[in-house]
Amino acid sequence: LYALYRFWGGKMNEMDTRFANQYNIQWFPGHMTKTLRMMEQEIQHVDASLVLLDARIPLSSLNPEIERITARKPKLYALNKADLADPAVTEEWIKYFRAADAGCVAISAKQKGGANAVKAAIEKELAGLLERRQNRGMGGAKTQVMLCGIPNVGKSTFINTFAGSARAKAADRPGVTKGKQWV
């Protein structure tokens, strides 16, 4: 629309606007579509989802497609990079997510304590499931959690800290770690 506006020298009337609006270009990167389809298939095989958000901009780092895909599973939000965010504001965000009946914890993925806090929060969120497994004699069954989030929220760093070794390559730019990984 802006290009058409510039083309006509900044003079667009109502008819021009209607014409421009009927030719909206819908564009979504193919690799993102592929990943979302894979997530839709894999969500059936996990017990819960862990959505990693940037503590400095939680709503901006929340992808609505991830929300849609993970809607039917127990969910835990981890506000990563909490050491870089204002603690008072981070606490308000935690209250916000908990008010929506979702678990939420503030962490710094670079510190081992963050991974331990997430593990404890996941166990709390899945207490009912773990108890049912115990009653059925499946107490030793592994809990599978899907870690998801937009690029550069710290997923690879979290995986490496949680696993205790460099399982995922991490860098300060998006697209370094691609594909599905079981840790």
Name each region found by the language model.
Residues 145-164:
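Glycine-rich phosphate-binding P-loop
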Residues 85-146:
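Canonical P-loop GTPase G-domain recognition
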Residues 56-58, 82-85, 110-113, 176-177:
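Conserved nucleotide-binding/hydrolysis micro-motifs of P-loop NTPases
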Residues 8-71:
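N-terminal accessory targeting/assembly segments
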Residues 29, 36, 57-60, 128-135, ...:
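Active-site phosphate-binding and catalytic loops of NTP-dependent enzymes
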Residues 47-53, 72-81, 102-106:
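Conserved beta-strand/loop subsegment of P-loop NTPase cores
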